[in-house]
C-alpha cells in the first residue's frame, strides 16, 4: 500500500528490510520496492547523502521521477517523466520565508510531453482503475480546493497574492 517517506530518513528507509524495527520500536513495514519522486531532489538535498545514494542505487528499487531537469535523483530513476514548470500549471504557494499566499496561473502552454504532477497522477489513477471523483479534478479545481479561509479564490486570482491574516509575533 502507498505510504509517505520522510525526507529526513529516506536514506535509511530505502535500505531497510521488511519488518525491521525502527528506533522508536515500531515495525518498519514492507521494504520499499517502488518510489515516485516529485518536487524534490533527495539525492542532492536529503541528509545522510551516502545512505540516500546507496538506497537509490538499489537494483531492486523501481524509481520514477517527475522532473523538468535531469537532477541527481533523476540520474538514478528507471523512468523520468517530463513535468511542467511553474510557468505551465496551476498551483497555490505559501512559503517559509513570508506570510503571503500566491496563486500560480499558467503563463505558457506545456512544452513537448510535459504534464503537471497532478495530471500525471490522474493518468496513473485512471490506468490503475481508480474512478473516484477526486481523480477527475483538473489542476485549477485542485488549486481552488487548496484555498481555505479568508482569501477567496477569485480575489486571489484577480490580485495574484494576499497577505495571510496571521497574528503579529
Show which residues each predicted segment covers.
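Extended redox/cofactor-interaction regions of prokaryotic respiratory oxidoreductases
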Residues: 1-75, 85-92, 155-169
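Catalytic cores of large soluble enzymes that bind and process phosphate-bearing ligands
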Residues: 2, 6, 27, 44, ...
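Short acidic (Asp/Glu) and glycine-rich catalytic loops that position anionic groups and cofactors
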Residues: 31-36, 97-106
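Flexible domain-boundary/linker segments
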Residues: 52, 80, 90, 141-142
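Short, well-ordered loop/turn and helix-capping segments at boundaries between secondary-structure elements
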Residues: 58, 62, 79-86, 123-133
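Short low-complexity, flexible loop/linker segments enriched in glycine and/or proline
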Residues: 79-81, 96-99
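Short beta-alpha connecting loops at secondary-structure transitions
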Residues: 84-87, 100-110
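N-terminal leader/propeptide and maturation segments of large enzyme subunits in energy/redox metabolism
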Residues: 108-169
Amino acid at each position: 500500500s502507498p505510504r509517505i517517506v520522510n525526507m529526513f530518513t529516506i536514506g535509511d528507509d530505502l535500505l531497510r528490510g521488511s519488518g525491521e524495527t525502527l528506533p522508536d520500536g515500531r515495525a518498519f513495514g514492507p521494504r520499499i520496492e517502488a518510489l515516485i519522486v516529485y518536487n524534490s531532489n533527495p539525492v542532492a538535498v536529503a541528509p545522510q547523502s551516502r545512505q540516500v545514494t546507496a538506497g537509490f542505487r538499489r537494483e531492486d528499487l523501481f524509481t520514477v521521477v517527475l522532473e523538468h531537469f535531469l537532477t541527481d535523483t533523476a540520474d538514478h530513476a528507471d523512468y523520468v517523466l517530463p513535468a511542467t514548470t511553474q510557468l505551465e500549471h496551476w498551483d497555490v504557494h505559501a512559503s517559509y520565508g513570508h506570510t503571503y499566499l500566491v496563486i500560480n496561473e499558467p503563463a505558457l502552454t506545456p512544452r513537448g510531453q510535459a504534464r503537471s504532477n497532478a495530471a500525471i497522477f490522474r493518468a496513473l489513477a485512471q490506468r490503475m482503475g481508480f474512478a473516484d471523483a477526486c481523480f477527475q479534478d483538473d489542476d485549477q479545481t485542485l488549486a481552488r480546493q487548496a484555498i481555505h479561509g479568508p482569501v477567496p479564490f477569485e480575489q486571489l486570482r484577480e490580485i495574484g497574492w494576499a497577505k495571510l491574516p496571521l497574528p503579529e509575533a
